Amino acid sequence: MSEPYLKPVSAEHPVEIGRPKRVILVDESALYAESWRAVLACRYGPAVSFEFYRDPIAALDALGPDVSLLLVDLELPLFGGRKLFELAKGRGVACRRIVILSSRPAEDLHQLFPDGSCLAVINKTESNQQNAFLMILDSIVKRH
């Protein structure tokens, strides 16, 4: 018998039960990435696979429908987070699995990415935004 599957939120491709959730961060800050790597490892252990890319072009090869959560810095060098957002969708990453990160005020982010265009927009520096982000992570990791 084949592996059991659950229907993902996006309904695009099945998600294997028991497989680690694939979380990808595309950001120019290695320190920011290491802080999230530590949080994910401590909070979820082997339930999460974390990948970090500084170069958005290199990240493109890793993107596909098997991504559980894609975190994109809006202020990426080269072509920016908005462009990577569009390219990720073109590679099969569901918009409901993409979170936009920025140091801009949340109100500005919501104007650039209205409700429903992505899973969430998160200000990197506001603690209440970080708490909301942890709730999103909990939901994704514990969903299946």
Question: Could you tell me what each predicted segment is?
Answer:
Residues 1-24, 28-38, 127-144:
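Non-catalytic signal-transmission and effector/linker regions of two-component phosphorelay proteins
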Residues 35-43, 112:
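Alpha-helical interaction/dimerization surfaces of two-component signaling modules
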Residues 37, 51-69:
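Acidic, metal-coordinating helix/loop segments flanking the phosphotransfer/catalytic sites
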Residues 56, 71-89, 95, 108:
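Conserved phosphotransfer microenvironments
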Residues 63-65, 89-95, 116:
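Conserved phosphotransfer cores of two-component systems
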Residues 70, 121-122:
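Two-component signal transduction core modules
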Residues 81, 112-120:
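As written
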